[in-house]
Amino acid sequence: AGRYAGGTPQQKGERSPVSKASPDNILLYLPQKQEDQVREIFAGLAERGFPVQQQRPHITVTFSPRMQPEVVDLAAQLLPAVIPADFRRVGNVIFGTKRKQTVAWLLETTNELEIAARKISAANSDGRGPRWTPHLTMGLRLPREEVPGYIQAMDELTSSHFKELSAVEAAYWRPRTQEKTVLAEA
């Protein structure tokens, strides 16, 4: 728990530089092999001229400008029972209605994780209530006009066999202080 050992957060794949607006997050991380597969897709998209994706591949449970300790405590209670967790890619989703949009893989998971994530989200006063849309962000803050081409390129670069994902770690990530606290591990 606490600060990363064995490398900087950037070496571990967290976004940098950190925006003052970057929220605290409770995140689920993939096994290294799957993370590398996603990064290969990011690299292929960048080679085609799309914006470079620097974020570490993850699935967000909830986020807040300043996460309340009771939300982190609840996540630490609920997530160990459901990690590792299996996910299945079921489509693409676009978040945002303004000039910059986010493209993500839409995911389905177990009822147990879905229930836990909804409880954690509901406990977060800055969250969306008991709603959770499991997804893995593939394109962050993309210009709206690039989204159709981005999705087409993403589909071309993604193996049709890469449908199953796993979450092997849950963590509380604080971008402002570059601190990651592991809440559950497989």
Where do the PLM segments sit?
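A structured binding-face within diverse protein domains that lines the active/interaction site
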Residues: 101, 105
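Basic, often amphipathic N-terminal segments
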Residues: 13-88, 107-166, 179-186
